[in-house]
Amino acid sequence: MEEIIKPVSKELLKAELTEDRRLRMTNKSNNQIYIITHQNAPNVMREIGRLREIAFRAAGGGTGLSMDIDEYDTMEHPYKQLIVWNPEAEEILGGYRYLLGTDVRFDEAGAPILATSHMFHFSDAFIKEYLPQTIELGRSFVTLEYQSTRAGSKGLFALDNLWDGLGALTVVMPNVKYFFGKVTMYPSYHRRGRDMILYFLKKHFNDREELVTPMEPLILETSDEELRTLFCKDTFKEDYKILNTEIRKLGYNIPPLVNAYMSLSPTMRMFGTAINYEFGDVEETGILIAVDEILEDKRIRHIQTFIESHPDALKMPCESEGVFTPKVVTPQEGCCH
């Protein structure tokens, strides 16, 4: 396990966080969203790598290297880094990395070069019909000091701030129809609790088209019969109550991102779970969320607010009319919002 690098100078960070790289202000806490790459902001990238490694190690994952920066961050056409910057404290409080489907390159075998390609197989239907309109998200993190269990009020809106950034992306890139990402669970999480969560997700969000499948699917340790007996209700709400109660009995909580993604859209697709052997053996569950099926309150909070404050963002030489009109979507009652 390598020693993590020292913090990058705030002056170096501020010099690279220029106005042309600023996307928006957040709805809460008056923080700023920036988009950078390794090439145009190498010092910010080093600080992101440092903060990611600290956060992931604390949760039981990480690379074990001095900072979490890989070839997908540094390649010729790299993943972009979306970060939340606290201008008052002059520090990064969280981030995602992302790649537009239209920017994806393919290897000699015709497989997409994605950070998840070593864990998941992407069907021809996904590559042709979904990928060109998809943003792949990864490496989501909240800096340790801003995680709500440690930070109190200042960490309360960290994840909310990040989603303000993702909401803005759907405005400035109106061809984007889907977010493809992963829910990460760590080996330290209770095994039976993990099995209950994954069974619940499969029951209510399973992708029957097999658009994306894990190359080595995770095998649950709890019997299918036991889980089927436990989650025997007809509705999401009733099964969710069971899940929440059983997880609490174990002395755990449902991971915040699991709750957060379920509360974004009732039509989320779950693609199964694979072990990421390159990242501390964490367990990665693939998911897909359709932008126009995000629940209205979330759409207004993270997308509509950006449109109202940045009307020029819609004045672009592509058809954006109707892009933000969501389908009629009924919330999953009983989920944590």
From Swiss-Prot:
GO MF entry, a single one: acyltransferase activity
Pathway as given in its UniProt record: Lipid metabolism
Keyword list, A-Z: Acyltransferase, Lipid biosynthesis, Lipid metabolism, Transferase
Domain of life, source organism: Bacteria
Factors inducing expression: Is constitutively expressed.
UniProt note: phenotype after gene disruption: Loss of production of monoacylated and diacylated glycine lipids, as well as other lipids such as flavolipin, an acylated serine-glycine dipeptide. Cells lacking this gene also show a strong growth defect when transition from growth in solid medium to growth in liquid medium, and are much more sensitive to a variety of stresses, including exposure to bile and air. The deletion mutant is also affected in its ability to colonize the murine gut, particularly during the early stages of colonization.
Signal peptide: none
Biological processes, Gene Ontology terms: lipid metabolic process
Cited InterPro entries: Acyl_CoA_acyltransferase (IPR016181), Ornithine_N-alpha-AT (IPR052351)
SUPFAM superfamilies in the record: Acyl-CoA N-acyltransferases (Nat)
Catalyzed reactions per annotation: a (3R)-hydroxyacyl-[ACP] + glycine = a lyso-glycine lipid + holo-[ACP] + H(+); (3R)-hydroxyhexadecanoyl-[ACP] + glycine = N-[(3R)-3-hydroxyhexadecanoyl]-glycine + holo-[ACP] + H(+)
Pfam families: Acetyltransf_5 (PF13444)
Keyword Transmembrane attributed: no
Function, in words: Is involved in the production of glycine lipids (GL), which are phosphorus-free membrane lipids important for fitness during growth of the human gut bacterium B.thetaiotaomicron in vivo and in vitro. Catalyzes the first step of GL biosynthesis, i.e. the N-acylation of glycine via addition of a 3-hydroxy fatty acyl group, to form a range of monoacylated glycine (also named lyso-glycine lipids or lyso-GL). Is important for the ability of B.thetaiotaomicron to adapt to stress and colonize the mammalian gut.
Family per similarity comment: Belongs to the acetyltransferase family.
Name this polypeptide is given: Glycine N(alpha)-acyltransferase
